[in-house]
Amino acid sequence: MTLQHEPSAAFAETLALRALTFLAADGERLGRFLSLTGIGPAELRRNAGESAMLAGVLEYLLQDETLLLVFATDVGVPPEAIPAAHRVLAGRQQGDDS
């Protein structure tokens, strides 16, 4: 299954929030995410709904193909939906989709 077009901003946000939930559901995954990104738990809670944080969560998944594939399977989306959603959120972060 391939994507025919870029996902909507709402889909991208929802997917990123699901990715954050996926990471948070496993202490080891969450610990690795926090360690590698340098984000603290308080900062994560405070900024969880921000485009920059959500883009960062998806970017983290993009750095680990195995984790990305596990997440995609877990939530039932094609793996290529993750970089597409990242592009949408990164564009919003940069103000490209006003």
What are these regions (language model features)?
Residues 1-98:
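Metal- and O2-centered redox machinery and metal/ROS homeostasis
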